Regions:
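Amphipathic alpha-helical hairpins
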Residues: 1-113
Length: 113
């Protein structure tokens, strides 16, 4: 089982990513010419992060494939965001998604042991 202090850290990182991805999805969806790949990747990342947070908050124990799924979607979101270097909000979303993916590696390694 993951220690509570560490669990809180994972929750904070995933929540921050979820919020930023949701904000990016909203901003893109309401723009005059939304970038559909960006909306898709940010939306999938947000859903995956929220699933991890929900499981961690409920103290359900086994995270199953949620961590690897989230790690994958965070990486894909980060890669998509990197395609728009002139846009600070999108770049920040990508950075936070990358940090989330790196942080979730710790849980993934812990689950393998």
């Amino acid at each position: 089982m993951i220690q509570q202090q560490t669990t809180d850290q994972y929750i904070k990182v995933c929540m921050k990513t979820w919020l930023l991805c949701e904000a990016s999805v909203h901003a893109e969806s309401t723009s005059t010419s939304p970038r559909h790949n960006l909306v898709k990747e940010c939306s999938e990342c947000a859903k995956a992060c929220f699933a991890v947070v929900s499981r961690l908050v409920s103290n359900a124990g086994d995270l199953g494939d949620l961590v690897l799924n989230c790690l994958l979607h965070c990486r894909q979101c980060s890669n998509e965001c990197e395609k728009y270097p002139g846009e600070e909000d999108i770049q920040f979303c990508g950075i936070v998604s990358s940090i989330c993916a790196d942080t979730l590696k710790e849980i993934a390694v812990h689950q393998l042991n």
